[in-house]
C-alpha cells in the first residue's frame, strides 16, 4: 500500500478528456501523421479541442488557432525590405543613393575604402562607353555639321508649324517635323 500512495502523489491530476488508446510507433495511424518527438512535429492535430476531428488536418496548433502553423525550425525570417545591412536587389530602394542616369544603382559620389577598386570601376566604364558611342553616332547622323552642304527635305505636304507662323522662327529649326514656309519648302 505505501507504494501506491507514492505513485498517486507523483501522477498529474486527471483531466476531463477521455483516455486515449496507446499508440504504437509505426506511423500507420488513421490520420497518417508520423510519430516523432513532439517538439519537432508540433502539437497533435486538434480542432475545437477534439482529437480525431475531421477538420483537424487544417489546424496544427492549439484550439482556436487560425491556419496552419509552421514549426520554428522550418520557418524563415521575413525579407529585410529596405532595412538591415543587405540592401542590394531587395525591393524598390536597393541603393541609398537612388538610381543613376542609365537606370543602374548609383554609387556614392566619393567611395571610401572598400567601395571602389578596379572591378567596380571597370564595370561602370564598360557599361557607359558603348552608350556614349551610340548616342554620339545618333547625334552625328541626325545633326550634320554646319560646314557640310545641307540638303533640305521638302516638308510642304505637312501642316505649317504654329510657332514659325507666329514668330517667324522655330527653336527646332531643321529638326522640326512641321512645314516652315520658305525654309524647308516653297513659300506660301
UniProtKB/Swiss-Prot annotation:
<protein>
    <recommendedName>
        <fullName>Proline-rich protein 3</fullName>
    </recommendedName>
</protein>
<feature type="zinc finger region" description="C3H1-type">
    <location>
        <begin position="155"/>
        <end position="183"/>
    </location>
</feature>
<feature type="region of interest" description="Disordered">
    <location>
        <begin position="1"/>
        <end position="157"/>
    </location>
</feature>
<dbReference type="InterPro" id="IPR042805">
    <property type="entry name" value="PRR3"/>
</dbReference>
<feature type="compositionally biased region" description="Pro residues">
    <location>
        <begin position="35"/>
        <end position="46"/>
    </location>
</feature>
<dbReference type="InterPro" id="IPR000571">
    <property type="entry name" value="Znf_CCCH"/>
</dbReference>
<feature type="compositionally biased region" description="Pro residues">
    <location>
        <begin position="69"/>
        <end position="82"/>
    </location>
</feature>
<keyword id="KW-0479">Metal-binding</keyword>
<feature type="compositionally biased region" description="Low complexity">
    <location>
        <begin position="83"/>
        <end position="96"/>
    </location>
</feature>
<feature type="compositionally biased region" description="Basic and acidic residues">
    <location>
        <begin position="145"/>
        <end position="157"/>
    </location>
</feature>
<dbReference type="InterPro" id="IPR036855">
    <property type="entry name" value="Znf_CCCH_sf"/>
</dbReference>
<keyword id="KW-0863">Zinc-finger</keyword>
<dbReference type="Pfam" id="PF00642">
    <property type="entry name" value="zf-CCCH"/>
</dbReference>
<dbReference type="GO" id="GO:0008270">
    <property type="term" value="F:zinc ion binding"/>
</dbReference>
<keyword id="KW-0862">Zinc</keyword>
Amino acid at each position: 500500500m505505501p507504494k501506491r500512495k507514492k505513485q498517486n502523489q507523483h501522477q498529474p491530476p486527471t483531466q476531463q478528456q477521455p483516455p486515449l488508446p496507446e499508440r504504437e510507433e509505426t506511423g500507420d495511424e488513421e490520420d497518417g501523421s508520423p510519430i516523432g518527438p513532439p517538439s519537432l512535429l508540433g502539437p497533435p492535430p486538434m480542432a475545437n479541442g477534439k482529437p480525431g476531428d475531421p477538420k483537424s488536418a487544417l489546424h496544427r496548433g492549439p484550439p482556436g488557432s487560425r491556419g496552419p502553423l509552421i514549426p520554428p525550425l522550418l520557418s524563415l525570417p521575413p525579407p529585410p525590405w529596405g532595412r538591415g545591412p543587405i540592401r542590394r536587389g531587395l525591393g524598390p530602394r536597393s541603393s541609398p543613393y537612388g538610381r543613376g542616369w542609365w537606370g543602374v544603382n548609383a554609387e556614392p559620389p566619393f567611395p571610401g575604402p572598400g567601395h571602389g577598386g578596379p572591378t567596380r570601376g571597370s564595370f561602370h566604364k564598360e557599361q557607359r562607353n558603348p552608350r556614349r558611342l551610340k548616342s554620339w553616332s545618333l547625334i552625328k547622323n541626325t545633326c550634320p555639321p554646319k560646314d557640310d552642304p545641307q540638303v533640305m527635305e521638302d516638308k510642304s505636304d505637312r501642316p505649317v508649324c504654329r510657332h514659325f507662323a507666329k514668330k517667324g522662327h522655330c527653336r527646332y529649326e531643321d529638326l522640326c517635323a512641321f512645314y516652315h514656309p520658305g525654309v524647308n519648302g516653297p513659300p506660301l
